Swiss-Prot record:
Physiological role: Central component of a redox-sensitive mitochondrial intermembrane space import machinery which is required for the biogenesis of respiratory chain complexes. Functions as chaperone and catalyzes the formation of disulfide bonds in substrate proteins, such as COX17 or MICU1. Required for the import and folding of small cysteine-containing proteins (small Tim) in the mitochondrial intermembrane space (IMS). Precursor proteins to be imported into the IMS are translocated in their reduced form into the mitochondria.
Quaternary structure and interacting proteins, as annotated: Monomer. Can form homooligomers.
UniProt short sequence motif Cx9C motif 2, positions renumbered to this chain: 87-97
Molecular-function GO term, any one: protein-disulfide reductase activity
Domain CHCH: 61-105
Gene from which this protein is expressed: chchd4
Subcellular localization: Mitochondrion intermembrane space
Protein name: Mitochondrial intermembrane space import and assembly protein 40
Sequence segments annotated as region (Disordered): 101-146
Chief place of localization: mitochondrion
Source organism of the structure: Danio rerio (Zebrafish)
Gene Ontology annotations for the cellular component aspect, listed alphabetically: mitochondrial intermembrane space
Database matches in Gene3D superfamilies: 1.10.287.2900
Length: 146
C-alpha cells in the first residue's frame, strides 16, 4: 500500500512493488493547439501570430511593443500583391518609436558593415585580370605560326 510523507514543502510518495506491477491508469491529455504556453513557432496552428515566440526576441513587449505588433500583424495578414506594401505607415510608426529609445533599440551603424579602410582600397595589383586581358596576353606570348 502506497502512502505519502510530508517533509517541509516536499511530499515523499512511497509505493510498493505491487503498485509498480499494475498497469498505469493515468490518462494523457491531448495537446491543445490553442494553448498559449505550449511551444509553437511564430505562427500558431490556427494562423495567428505567436507573440510569445522567442524568435521575436522580445520585440512584442517593451515601449514599442504595440507598434511592433501593429506593423508585424499588418505584414502577416497583408493581401497586397507586394506583401506588406500597405503597411508602410505601421513600420514608420514602429521606427519612430524605436528612435525614441536608442538604448533599447540600437541603430545599425553604416561604418560597422563596411570593411576597414573603405570599399575601394584594394591595391590594383591584387585585382584579377579579366578573361579578355588574359586571352590577349596569351596571344602575344604565343603568336600563331602560319
Amino acid at each position: 500500500m502506497s502512502y505519502c510523507k510530508q517533509e517541509g514543502k516536499d511530499c515523499i510518495i512511497f509505493v510498493t512493488k505491487e503498485d509498480h506491477e499494475a498497469p498505469s491508469n493515468a490518462e494523457l491529455v491531448e495537446d491543445d493547439p490553442n494553448d498559449p504556453y505550449e511551444d509553437h513557432g511564430l505562427i500558431l496552428p490556427n494562423g495567428d501570430i505567436n507573440w510569445n515566440c522567442p524568435c521575436l526576441g522580445g520585440m512584442a513587449s517593451g515601449p514599442c511593443g504595440q507598434q511592433f505588433k501593429d506593423a508585424f500583424s499588418c505584414f502577416h495578414y497583408s493581401k497586397e500583391e507586394i506583401k506588406g506594401s500597405d503597411c508602410v505607415e505601421n513600420f514608420r510608426g514602429m521606427q519612430e518609436c524605436m528612435q525614441k529609445y536608442p538604448e533599447l533599440y540600437p541603430q545599425e551603424d553604416d561604418n560597422d558593415s563596411a570593411p576597414s579602410g573603405g570599399a575601394n582600397t584594394a591595391p590594383t595589383d591584387s585585382l584579377p585580370a579579366s578573361s579578355t586581358d588574359s586571352t590577349a596576353a596569351a596571344a602575344t606570348e604565343n603568336p600563331a605560326t602560319s
